């Protein structure tokens, strides 16, 4: 009798274990399937500008359950780009983000007509159907972060003002646009205004968070 009770107990434990394991597998599969993928193609060599753009892209991806498929390219022909885009579409990527393609595309005179591609670019706006860029601003313009030496010149009156390019914002709004495109199938160009920084703006403290990043 005791042996039968032990057998029943073992069977119940085994059933509970199988049920728990199955539920965990289903949860893992559901969580994986719910995540979206964005392909990011960027120059092989990092610099301050690319780094802050990528930081923003990673932050948005983390906060919105997006997987990033990152490509580092030294040189990329139009055929190789088409091949990458086809591969990413087959993997159900919601979009492809090109970071400064002028630094790796070998055929810059072509028009790259892709609805699901957004190019962050300073010089190739006409080459893409959709792009993100900074608005034109009077010089001098600086990338964030701005050095303390430059800020001090403004505070001392040696420089009237400068204009800063927020590359983090550029990257963040770019991946956000691709995410939005995946839901409503509508993409539009992005223009990020340059922020004017003068003595009054610095002394007001309104730009503290921006300038210290």
What are these regions, as identified by a protein language model?
Residues 2-15:
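N-terminal Sec-pathway targeting helices
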Residues 22-35:
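Sec-dependent signal peptide cleavage junction
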Residues 34-38, 148:
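Nucleotide donor/acceptor-binding cores
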Residues 39-56, 60, 69-79, 101:
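Extracytoplasmic "Venus flytrap"
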Residues 51-54, 58, 78-85, 105-109, ...:
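Extracytoplasmic/secreted envelope proteins and their assembly/folding machinery
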Residues 74-127, 135:
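Beta-alpha junction/loop-to-helix N-cap segments that form part of ligand/metal-binding clefts
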Residues 115-128, 136-158, 197-198, 202:
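Venus flytrap/periplasmic-binding-protein-like
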Residues 146, 169, 173-213:
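Hinge/cleft segment of the Venus flytrap/periplasmic-binding protein
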